[in-house]
Amino acid sequence: MAPPTKRTRVEMAESSNKRMKPSETVPEDVLELMMSTYLPVQSLLTTRVLSKRFRETEVRSLDLDFSGIYSRRRRKVEVVGIIEKVFNQHKGSEIHRFVLLLNHIGVEDKIISWTNTCFDKNIKELVLDFSKSRKVMAIPIDFSAVESLQVLKLRWCKFEIPDSSPKGLKLLKTLSLMRTQVMVKTIDAIFNNCIHLESLELIECRMDGILSIRAQNHKKFKSLVVSFMPDLRHIRLDAPTLENYKYDGYVICVNILITNALKEANLYYTRIRRLYHQKSDLVDTLRFYTRLTVLATTTIFLEALTKRYVGEGRLENPPFKFENLTEFKISFITPTFCTLFDIAEFLKECPKLKQVVIDIQNFTFEPQMYFWEIHHKAQIQNTSNNNYLLKCLTDVKIIGYKGHWHELDIVEFFVKNAPSLKRLELQMPKNAKNDAHTPDVARIKLIKTIFSGVKVTEV
């Protein structure tokens, strides 16, 4: 087929330009209605300022997102005035989304008025973030009467819900609470009322003792996030449909009654005052994670899997295999005794593993590692028995690579033991010149003769 001539290309461009003028084909009243309804409110306000044609356009926006209203460093009184004006001028019958990031002190009455207007207009998504005030707002919202809401995110805002509400939050799919008091009756009320709940986030909330989730009758509950709730001592989950579990905090007791659906877990364990915890606290929970396909965790998790004395001078690993795991990320935290040996011992129990990420951006190995040198190095580097063969592994990434000799041990391990390896990326921090080690040119050359696809990037 012959390429188009210059004249043909010009005609095509002219035809395209004609099609790109919607105002010539769409009636002006329809265009104005579409803009006033479907443009996010801040885009609509900007259009009204910049365009004379749309200066008198009514406010019917379904999306009232004011999260970026501080971008021009407006004063609080100006921000409140803009929002108040929008609500006073809003002519639409519905508001689907209201996002507010504001210091609430002194304007509580206006916030209550705005939210009540949203409830009257069948709000579907409500996000209230009062973190700017650094003080929890006790907003008197009666959620027992809110039926249309599907997404609710509250930051630094008190949350209450009656235990047996006939309508309240029956359609809610996503609930995210941050920096608020959560009690046992609150959790019970959530799962008694929100029968369509899919996702629950509890971030920096205050709750003592036990977090018990009874979702055995829920068919859609798939995701749970529990982040930094230091007063918790135990988590008990009866959630047969749970697929994704994220926990960030100290090692505590966990009991998951049914794990058939659980596929992904992010277990970012931290230490209490930089002390070591009892290994048994974590070992007792490992059985709940053996069916995972995706796991992200810290070195505290690996420490629980290291060999222990079982009597008569014998050392044994806890008997856990992760036969479905395909993606694994390990973040090194200080202090830790973990080395390549601990990584390799875990990986050999993951026969389907395809991707590995090792994050050492906030960690540096010691200059001398005598235990590794004396007890583990020879075992790891012995390739005659292929104990550490990773047949399915294709992708490896090391975040925070600084050229330390033990980092090269890790790189060499993967290029020698992963016959299907396709990508090996070493991400170096741009500001790590003071931490970077003198390159071991000879060793790097040896590694590249085994696998030439090593890629070094700066991030």
Swiss-Prot record:
Q: Where is this region: Disordered?
A: 1-25
Entries under SUPFAM superfamilies matching the protein: RNI-like
> Which residues does the UniProt record annotate as the domain F-box?
21-69
Residue intervals of the FBD domain: 396-428
Top-level taxonomic group: Eukaryota
Check the record and name the PANTHER family matching this protein: OS02G0105600 PROTEIN, PTHR34145:SF77
Q: What is this protein called?
A: FBD-associated F-box protein At1g61320
Q: Which species expresses this protein natively?
A: Arabidopsis thaliana (Mouse-ear cress)
Q: What is the lineage of its organism?
A: Eukaryota, Viridiplantae, Streptophyta, Embryophyta, Tracheophyta
